[in-house]
């Protein structure tokens, strides 16, 4: 194997927008800024919102449900 072909893998601090600091290793130099982390992301904190899209489906079916259906023959 060739010597000195791999980048330096150093310990850095990744700082989240909420102030949480995570120590990690990377080829990047200097501190890293994160938008979200496990301390502030809604999925991990349990504050996630569940969207109810059932109303949209019902609205679509009411508008286009009969589209393409054959008309009943009149006697």
From Swiss-Prot:
One Gene Ontology term, aspect cellular component: ribosome
CC cofactor: Zn(2+)
Pfam families for this protein: Ribosomal_L31
UniProt GO BP: translation
Binding site for Zn(2+): 16, 18, 37, 40
Keyword list, A-Z: Metal-binding, Ribonucleoprotein, Ribosomal protein, RNA-binding, rRNA-binding, Zinc
UniProt remark on cofactor binding: Binds 1 zinc ion per subunit.
Molecular function per GO: metal ion binding; rRNA binding; structural constituent of ribosome
Domain of life: Bacteria
Family: Belongs to the bacterial ribosomal protein bL31 family. Type A subfamily.
Annotated function: Binds the 23S rRNA.
Assembly behavior: Part of the 50S ribosomal subunit.
Descriptive protein name: Large ribosomal subunit protein bL31
Gene it is expressed from: rpmE
